[in-house]
Amino acid sequence: MPGANYRAGAGAGAGARRPRGARDREEDGGGLEPAAVARDLLRGTSNMSFEELLELQSQVGTKTYKQLVAGNSPKKQASRPPIQNACVADKHRPLEMSAKIRVPFLRQVVPISKKVARDPRFDDLSGEYNPEVFDKTYQFLNDIRAKEKELVKKQLKKHLSGEEHEKLQQLLQRMEQQEMAQQERKQQQELHLALKQERRAQAQQGHRPYFLKKSEQRQLALAEKFKELKRSKKLENFLSRKRRRNAGKDRRHLPLSKE
């Protein structure tokens, strides 16, 4: 009969899409078992088309399908013993590892925190440098330096010659240079403060404040230095040293005399 032939043909097509064992289990059990389907379908996947393979993947699941294509059954995968991670009974005992495993180049050791050096001059925790506040805070150091200078002078009187005399002389000279540099720095701070007060007064009067150039500030500082040297009667010595220094510089630029 035509109807019977059609049903037979449909049944044959369904059998080509799915193996007989899987269809029988589906009809008997009412559902698909991934392990049983995988065992039955392992032999028939090579003859299936791409659409049939996609349908099979949707029926058994992606994981089981990949194991099926790779040739590993879920039973074999489940029969493998789980790999246990290396562990130790006591945390203070060294770790036991297999001698067959190659030791990595970069071993995992206990991390040690890096010691970071802190320079208070460039650290934000110390705040911004303010010369006025610094001088007021460490003003007691000037008294200590003055006492040390007097002590060096007394020691210098005891040692009139020899190596100790040269060391004390160099120390006294370095202390005097530091004192002169400190006085010069203090004069510059006073000059900046005076200019700042003058600009503030101009702004209060309604005038536009005038900011001096660095060259003009250096000229004002040099004029104050000359006034201070003149008051202390050291201007002539300063000018003579300045002339000798300039003469030496000019002599280096002169052409050499030919014999």
Swiss-Prot record:
One of its GO terms (molecular function) is RNA binding. Residues 1-38, 233-259 are annotated as: Disordered. One of its GO terms (biological process) is rRNA processing. Pfam families: RRP36 (PF06102). Residues 157-205 form a coiled coil. It comes from the Eukaryota. Involved in the early processing steps of the pre-rRNA in the maturation pathway leading to the 18S rRNA. This is Ribosomal RNA processing protein 36 homolog. The lineage of its organism: Eukaryota, Metazoa, Chordata, Craniata, Vertebrata.
